[in-house]
């Protein structure tokens, strides 16, 4: 237990320019607490590694590895002469060898090793910058730290109890710079988490160490009541409950890994999302629920470009098996089902437009394929706020605002903290603007 410790996570959006690294140095240097840093790969590096794996070209592996090296050296010249130069060069040699090996014998393990190189190089680069500024630190790779992952990909979670039992950091003498996004499985093989998994690395470490708080540094001011992509003057949210944050993480722009708050819940540890470059903004704090006398919608999550997939169901006795079969085949294909509603005679699933054709092909290949049709695209709106699910006033506000603007809104499901609806894709922007205005979410 290191109650005075803080965990700081720096993602790829904060690892783009030299100014970003200088800002990280200032943040680390100004802290009076013991610190653990978690890093993602430099901006764009993971995508480049993925592209290289997909191309599968042996002829350009040397040039590709050299370009990855140059990306880090141009941003962090100190890495070429500092204490981590040998480890930096060896990591690049291993990357090149693994790329050649993957061409000969592709495997999930080799692929994970290649992709994890981005985080390893990032940790070495950041250590080089910090060391050059007289900040004592060391790279702490996940396989060395003992970050064990149960499951993999979007379903992967970190074994917090195992970290708690075995992790030893001497934080008084050196700041560990931990690689995010990946860990090891029971066979000691590199295993990746899902998109945004570095968030989960940071919160799992915070829970294991019983740290004071965890901060995820970003390139924006905090969480807004509406995603910035819609260009509406949205309110900045100073506080979110764990539950509200999970809903927004699932049904909005990627602001946080959906599982990131889970290690923190039972301990009540706070999580902050803060802008790296703005000292005057506290960002958004995430923590336990705060009871209010009058429930209100605090934010709207929005998932556009979804295709409703209508499936005809047979007799009552075959409904559950059919839905289970469809869910299983789509799950195996990694097709996310954002909503599933069953009624007498039919089921309605929401999948992304991009996945709709693939989903129907899978259904048509079943031994006894069900009848199905793809309906016009919709947008899923999630109205988020503690206690809104059963609040008649909130329900009436949404319905009356939609009726006043002739918005074809359809209610899907609700929970204690969220109300979910769909609107036709072509009505997305007007629905967001009119509903957000009625719910007082705009400035």
Predicted feature locations:
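Nucleotide/pyrophosphate-binding catalytic subdomain
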Residues: 1-256, 261, 352, 422-427
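Short phosphate-binding/catalytic loops that engage adenosine nucleotides
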Residues: 33, 135, 269, 335, ...
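Short secondary-structure capping/turn micro-motifs that flank functional sites
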Residues: 145-148, 222-223, 279-281, 346-347, ...
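A conserved active-site cap/scaffold subdomain adjacent to cofactor or substrate pockets
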Residues: 241-315
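A conserved regulatory-domain signal marking ACT and ACT-like small-molecule sensing domains
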Residues: 283-443
